[in-house]
A protein has these predicted regions:
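Short, structured patches in soluble enzyme cores that scaffold and shape functional sites
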Residues: 13, 22-30, 48-53, 82, ...
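Catalytic-pocket segment enriched in acidic/His residues
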Residues: 56-170
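Short helix/loop capping segments that flank catalytic or ligand/cofactor-binding pockets
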Residues: 5, 35-37, 57-59
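Extended, compositionally biased flexible segments
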Residues: 1-12
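Residue-level recognition of short, solvent-exposed, well-ordered loop/turn junctions
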Residues: 4, 19-21, 131, 155-156
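General beta-strand structural signal in soluble alpha/beta enzymes
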Residues: 3-4, 49, 138, 162
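N-terminal accessory regions of nucleic-acid-interacting proteins
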Residues: 33-47
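Short helix-loop capping/hinge motifs at secondary-structure junctions, enriched
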Residues: 32-35, 87-89
Length: 170
């Protein structure tokens, strides 16, 4: 599903609930297995912008794993940059936003993340080895289409623009 930050997004055939999610991406730089939160920073190469697109019907209404709604072709734009960890003073205090067709849909901050970067790396490393190049998408702020009343979803031809402070824009 991973594509470049400016590649076209293709809404899947039979999709009616394709949704957007601006997220902080954490790029692993050193193998991590069973590490503590205090050790997590040693395993980070850097950070990037991720649009963790989701097809909500595939994800939630067709039973089973969420992977069906998260792994559609072109659903993982990443970048435009890998910003090394030494260039990010506090990954838990970055503004983030996403516009659809010029309208601001998400306007948040990494400081409102349910789980911090160090916790996520430590937690995941207890269940799987994290390898250099792995990217962890850390969650999205309010403003996804599924959460609106009435719900709003992407249509072919819609344009998204998103960014995270200091990490660039897509």
């Amino acid at each position: 599903a991973i594509v470049g930050p400016n590649d076209d997004i293709h809404i899947p055939k039979n999709s009616q609930k394709s949704d957007w999610e601006v997220e902080l991406g954490v790029v692993i730089g050193k193998e991590a297995k069973y590490i503590s939160e205090d050790q997590a920073q040693e395993h980070i190469a850097g950070y990037c912008v991720v649009n963790d697109l989701s097809e909500r019907a595939f994800q939630l209404e067709h039973s089973g794993q969420w992977v069906k709604g998260k792994s559609c072709d072109t659903f993982g734009p990443i970048g435009p940059y890998l910003v090394t960890k030494d260039e990010v003073a506090d990954p838990q205090n970055l503004s983030m936003w996403l516009d659809v067709n010029g309208k601001r849909m998400q306007d948040g901050s990494t400081k409102t993340m349910v789980y911090g970067v160090n916790f996520l790396i430590s937690y995941l490393s207890k269940f799987m080895s994290l390898q250099p190049g792995d990217i962890i998408s850390t969650g999205t702020p309010p403003g996804v289409g599924m959460g609106m009343k009435p719900q709003v979803f992407l249509k072919p031809g819609d344009e998204m623009k998103l960014g995270i402070e200091g990490l660039g824009e897509q």
